[in-house]
């Protein structure tokens, strides 16, 4: 009896199973998606980097006039980038709200489906466990009945032998 265990020893479902949102979008995909949504921001960052590199080169050369020009260009490029960020944020705000609502609804339906699968799995496990316990109880009752039957048989045989020896 020590070796008998529940018939289904598979692990129970986990709350981390099938978390598609966690695995859907990697970093590169997210960068490309953001680049497609707002292509002027990387352009502004590139202009800023170009202006900083130009300013550092002109500083090494000692050309103060070009250094000041590149620093002004850097300022304009950064202003352009910030303006594009603000305008892009205003433009994409409605889309982001819709996307969040959609993702929230999708997550809710997936959560409900996962919960339903979890409950079905638990119900199946419970039924299996009840059936296993019932079989085990029948087996132990059968062994007890069998043991009782042997005891009764020994008692009957003893009574017969007493009756035979006493001559009844």
UniProtKB/Swiss-Prot annotation:
Q: Which UniProt keywords apply?
A: Coiled coil, Membrane, Mitochondrion, Transmembrane, Transmembrane helix
Residues in a coiled coil are: none
Which cysteines are cross-linked by disulfides? none
Tell whether Mitochondrion is among the UniProt keywords.
yes
Q: Which residues form the HIG1 domain?
A: 12-103
Q: Which domain of life is it from?
A: Eukaryota
Return the Pfam families for the record.
HIG_1_N (PF04588)
GO BP annotations of the record are: mitochondrial respirasome assembly
Task: Please list every transmembrane segment annotated in the UniProt record, as residue ranges.
Answer: 40-56, 75-92
- InterPro entries on file: Hypoxia_induced_domain (IPR007667), RCF1 (IPR050355)
> What GO terms fall under cellular component here?
mitochondrial membrane; mitochondrion
Q: Where is this gene product found?
A: Mitochondrion membrane
Membrane topology value: Multi-pass membrane protein
What family is this protein classified in?
Belongs to the RCF1 family.
This molecule's function is given as: Cytochrome c oxidase subunit which plays a role in assembly of respiratory supercomplexes.
Q: How does it assemble?
A: Associates with the respiratory chain complex III/complex IV supercomplex.
Protein name from the UniProt record: Respiratory supercomplex factor 1, mitochondrial
């Amino acid at each position: 009896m020590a070796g008998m265990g529940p018939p289904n020893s598979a692990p129970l479902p986990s709350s981390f199973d099938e978390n598609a949102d966690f695995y859907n979008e990697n970093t590169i995909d997210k960068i490309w998606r953001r680049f497609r949504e707002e292509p002027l921001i990387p352009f502004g960052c590139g202009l800023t980097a170009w202006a900083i590199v130009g300013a550092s080169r002109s500083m090494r050369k000692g050309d103060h006039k070009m250094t000041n020009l590149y620093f002004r260009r850097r300022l304009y490029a950064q202003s352009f980038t910030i303006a594009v960020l603000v305008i892009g944020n205003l433009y994409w705000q409605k889309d982001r709200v819709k996307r969040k609502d959609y993702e929230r609804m999708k997550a809710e339906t997936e959560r409900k489906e996962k919960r339903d699968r979890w409950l079905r799995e638990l119900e199946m496990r419970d039924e299996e466990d009840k059936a296993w316990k019932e079989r085990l109880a029948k087996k132990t009752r059968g062994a007890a009945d069998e043991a009782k039957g042997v005891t009764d048989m020994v008692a009957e045989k003893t009574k017969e032998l007493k009756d035979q020896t006493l001559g009844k």
